[in-house]
Amino acid sequence: MKKTLTKLPFLLLVGILALSACAPAATTSTEAPEAAPTEAATDEPVATEEVVDAPFTAQVDADLVEAFTALYQAYYPDGTPAIVDSEADLLVTAVAAPEGVPTAIPATFLPGAVLLPQSDSADVADFVAFAISINGQQALIDAGLLPAVVTVTDQGGNSVEIAQPLHTLISTYGPVTAMVYAVNGEETLAAASYLGARDAAGAAAMEAIDPRFQDLIGDDYFSQTEFNIEEAARLAPDLIVTSLRTEWLDTAGELGIPFVLYDAETPDRLKEAMLLTGDLFGPQSAAQAEAWVAYYDWITAAILSETETIAEADRPSVLFTGTEPLRVASGDMYQTSLIEIAGGVSVSGELTGYWNDVNLEQIAAWDPDVIIVPPYGGATVEAITENPDWQILTAVQEGRVYRMPKLVVPWDTPAPDSALGIIWLAERLFPELETPDCTEQANFFYNTFYDYAIPSEQVESICAIN
């Protein structure tokens, strides 16, 4: 089940430095490296003269005592924290930014300041969960230690002021809905548009991640083309997140609700979008966004280290089709970036805009080595491989027509899950190279960013050649 703001996140329950069952080791180039050792702040911990009767003890950096005390007194209104200088149940400290891929994302209550449980105490677990919740964030705002308003610049170049903490949110753009989940902001969702959840398998997976899914899905009301102003007014969200290509922005403006625009059709813009999403929700979400960016950078570096020396003439040509076989991805779309990172050459990369409709003569002229179809819109491999007109193509003749995977969110879209799409595509294009293993990384990814323990048979099926 997905992490909530009322329970300690799964990763913390199993230990801040432990994800060995789902996080890859760092022994070969196909496995995620271990995190760099955490550097604690140089401030000496502050201890009380006498340990008071408290549910747990804490070792606290000197400059974090005020924040810790504010949280403690908000959670235990009549209590006094027991601050000690060693052997504490909870370590409250500042840490340097990790240089490698983190094996866990610690509870971050202020930028760069974390809560590290040192025991299995349920009281510690409950307190840590509170500290990174909306209520904990509010306690730090009331103490003047976090801002009551944050100002972000969205991907349309707009400066947007957002009251903190964020309580309710409408997401009308599926890729951004996935970003909200990946940074632990889903508790704020009042309604959302979801990618990949229309089929039974996608809906079942989404319900396993978030039991509220059936109550939240709002595709009939909110999408890039639809906006039900009456329903939006009823839900009264603090914020609306949507695509830069959305058609109803003027209508939404009538409500006076701030909205943040996204346009993440390149890897750099996707990383920017994730960091933007983290900033909407506070320090814990910002830390999760930073961890995802580090993970994405590791994957792209691992793939590029294997593919960047391949001569242009030896790179397979790839066609990415859309919901119809004759609809193809342009060079302005994220799918083209995935192909390039994985070591291929997009045959339709010179096209501009969004999806382009072409004819079979054009595809025959391109004659791609590999064809990728998406896992949405009813697109199938068989629509191409069983069509007699397509038998002239090299990709069809050599059996290299594949369907991009998905659990819920399709792995080709500008969303967090696309990190796995890079791995999967590189395995299809260059099976002989040492690239990160799809099944290992899918386990790591969904545990870390969705707190979902994906069943082994399911992940093996998703990563398999289809």
State what each model feature region is:
Residues V14-E50, T103:
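Ser/Thr-rich, Proline-interspersed low-complexity disordered segments
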Residues E44-T57, Y76, N158-P165, V183, ...:
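Immediate post-signal peptide segment of exported/extracytoplasmic ligand-binding proteins
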Residues A47-A148:
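Exported/periplasmic ABC-transporter solute-binding proteins
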Residues V52-A62, T80-I83, V150-T151, H167-I170, ...:
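Short, well-ordered beta-strand elements
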Residues D61-T80, I134, A178-E187, G196-E207, ...:
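Short, polar/charged alpha-helical segment
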Residues A122-D126, L146-V152, S159, W248-R327, ...:
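Extracytoplasmic substrate-binding proteins
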Residues S171, T177-L235, L239-R245:
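A short, structured surface patch at a secondary-structure boundary
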Residues V328-W355:
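Alpha-helical, coiled-coil/dimerization segments enriched in small aliphatic residues
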